[in-house]
Curated annotation (Swiss-Prot):
Pfam families, per database record: Arg_tRNA_synt_N, DALR_1, tRNA-synt_1d
Main location: cytoplasm
Family label: Belongs to the class-I aminoacyl-tRNA synthetase family.
Subcellular location: Cytoplasm
UniProt enzyme class: ligase
Keyword list, A-Z: Aminoacyl-tRNA synthetase, ATP-binding, Cytoplasm, Ligase, Nucleotide-binding, Protein biosynthesis
SMART domains, A to Z: Arg_tRNA_synt_N, DALR_1
Subunit relationships: Monomer.
Protein name: Arginine--tRNA ligase
GO cellular component, one term: cytoplasm
Any one GO molecular-function label of the UniProt entry: ATP binding
Amino acid sequence: MNIENYLSETLAKVFQKLGYAESFAKVVTSTREDVGHFQCNGAMPLAKFAKKPPLAIAEEIVEHIDAEDIFAKLEVAKPGFINITLAPKFLADTTNRFLNSNKFGVQNNLPNRKVVLDFGGPNVAKPMHVGHIRSALLGDALQRIHRFCGDTVVSDVHLGDWGTQMGMLIEEIKLQSPQLVYFDENYTGEYPTESPVTVQELAEIYPRASKRCKSDINEMEKARLATFELQQGRRGYVALWQHFVRISIDAVKKDFDSLDVHFDLWLGESDANKFIDEMISYFQANNFIYEDEGAWVIDTNKDGVPPLIVIKKDGGVMYGTTDLATLWQRSKDLDPDEIIYVVDKRQSLHFKQVFSVAERTKVVSEKCKLKHVAFGTVNGKDGRPFKTREGGVMHLADLISQAKEYAKNRMPDENDDSIIDQIAMATIKFGDLINNYANDYFFDLEKFAQHEGKTGPYLLYTAVRAKSILRKIFGDNYDIKSLAKDYKVVNAHNEYEEKLQLQLIQFPIAVQRAYENSQPHHICEYAYSLANSFNKFYVNCPITNLDDESLKKARIALCMATVKAMTIASDLIGISIPERM
């Protein structure tokens, strides 16, 4: 139950009864806890239509509200705010209900939706680096949130395995080892099962090939021709390319596993290639495509969005073509309700073109919503893209090692490597996901690793503190689900209990915002606020040594609720909580 929605519906009945539009009855969490728990600001915009002062409207609404079981206090403040304080029993009962529900008050979406999530997107032959974490962590959080809310999710890594960089690699290896059978057009036998290069060598070859092509137009033309021949099915090139893909996927899977990020599909741009001819024929049959200076293009019919080039003058295909073919494939195979791309904001124009063409040509069905989660860049302390101390790109494996080092330095007596791993992951993931995805942010690992402030380790520390209370009372093998039946939250005895209860019941609000806006930072902010509320409760409300047995049980219930909410919230952003720290 989203408490904001519940209160909005309660007030909406009064608005309707008085002849006002229900849409003005929206209730939100109060921006000032000293005046109330929640507030309704609808009287201000309503005044324009009702031709009455907003203060008079607010007073009229409050006068007609009859819900003493929900509200302890309803106050009107200038120029027309309605400040709402919940009744202690309603607050306690709601917290109790959440404690005893599987998803801590969150209800499944109805009807069930099928969502395709496209994220990760590493390129073949390029090791994953710090710049890849945004798509990986944001995409993973979104698939966790969508599944939690009841959606059927299909996640696809969508490898970059079919562009000009493949031709660059082929030409560079040909230059380096021209004797390899892959380059003999007359060879008809079986190709070797072992790759002629390792993934480490591939990572060294690509920068060399890229530099050569950028500095020499003739080399770039060779690479483009090799790419074209690969896409046309030249046997030796396809066999060599298959080696590139296989060894790259093996390496990338290890990187994603280290982040606990997983995919349902491991498809790449190449998998959509077989649909391109069918799709082009469809475009031609329906007069969507036309020739322009030797290339074939499709208009977007959107102001400020240029036409999309589908086939180049030389007959090669563009990234946009492959992305359209991928949408074609997903639409036919999966028939989704929504496809979400988690790709950096520098690709915004590209996706506007692709989405516009896909919708206009009905490559996707009318029910299918296309969304680009356009995230900002990961920058260092200097405001520039994050680099190593030596000025190079920091590989993901090195970043994780550094996070583990920070964790170990702060806990030198911790000998359990799994706990160090959990702290390192919380450091990286929370440090990234606490930021609104649309913004660039400064990646400061030293700051993220602090055990105080808005950090992953602080969340873990707080959750472990709450767990330690339960372990002290019930032993190591306690089970919150079965215990919660005998331990109930009761009316708050002081402000610390009240604020903790109030924070606990806002979990569904955070989940709904994260879900609807593709913004996991709402979950992070919730978890941080919950941690703060619990720590104040912990300091000011004794539990284990309490003589009052009924009060002790009520506070134990609040500890249970905190552990449950914190565990679920942490899992939604890919963080696991240790038993001890």
